[in-house]
Amino acid sequence: MKRRVEPELMEEADQALAYTQADFSEPNALFLRLLKELEPGSLAGARALDLGCGPADIVLRFLTTYPLAQCDALDGSAAMLAHAREALDRRPGLARRCQLIQDLLPSDQLPGAHYDLILSNSLLHHLHEPDVLWQTVTHCAKPGALVLIMDLMRPPSAGWAEALVSTYADDAPEVLRNDFRNSLFAAFEPNEVAAQLVQAGIDGLEIAVVSDRHLAVWGRLAS
């Protein structure tokens, strides 16, 4: 099935609210399990970068799991970051270790060779030019940094996409059902992501299908 791009940002208030209120506990928990499989240790003193942080659920999970780490969290949507700020304000102990950044990729607010860990969940499919994500990874990561990028995976047919929408968003508001459907059409296949890594000159990362609708790019960059 051919890729269909979708808007890069969720800027509408109703979109951001529906996304924030949706139950993404299953994929977000999967993301943290995959991170643990990378055996990052305690991450004491480590600084992570979360690209496309949305309402910051993964940021909160990360900071809770790794209490000695810090995280910079970037998103281009002011509406999403407003929900992220509200979530962090409810957890002041975690908020002290997080900096929210509103910007698009490429971002001149992100320092080079600065981060021990690069995280991203559900950003890649939003990007019309996916190379910008991999350029940001190589620019921002320290040598030997850990990388975990998880995203939706484009299904082979429109019927398959509709079945996934029915399975995982059957009771969701229509705005969220439409966003999920559009995101499935906009997502990449594993072989396309592999080609992106080759184009970016990134070695050492593994691509894996990690659910019936997600793929992950993970591993450690060369030192």
Each language-model region and where it sits:
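A short, conserved alpha-helix within the catalytic core of class I
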Residues: 127-137
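Conserved beta-strand signature within the Rossmann-like core of class I S-adenosyl-L-methionine
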Residues: 145-151
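N-terminal, positively charged/glycine-rich alpha-helical extensions of SAM-dependent methyltransferases
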Residues: 1-18
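A short SAM/SAH-binding and catalytic strip from SAM-dependent methyltransferases
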Residues: 117-129
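A short acidic, Gly/Pro-enriched loop at the edge of an enzyme's catalytic core
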Residues: 110-117
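Class I SAM-dependent methyltransferase SAM/SAH-binding core
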Residues: 49, 56-107
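C-terminal alpha-helical "lid/dimerization" subdomain adjacent to the S-adenosyl-L-methionine
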Residues: 152-200, 206-208
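Conserved alpha-helix/loop element of class I SAM-dependent methyltransferases that forms part
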Residues: 25-44
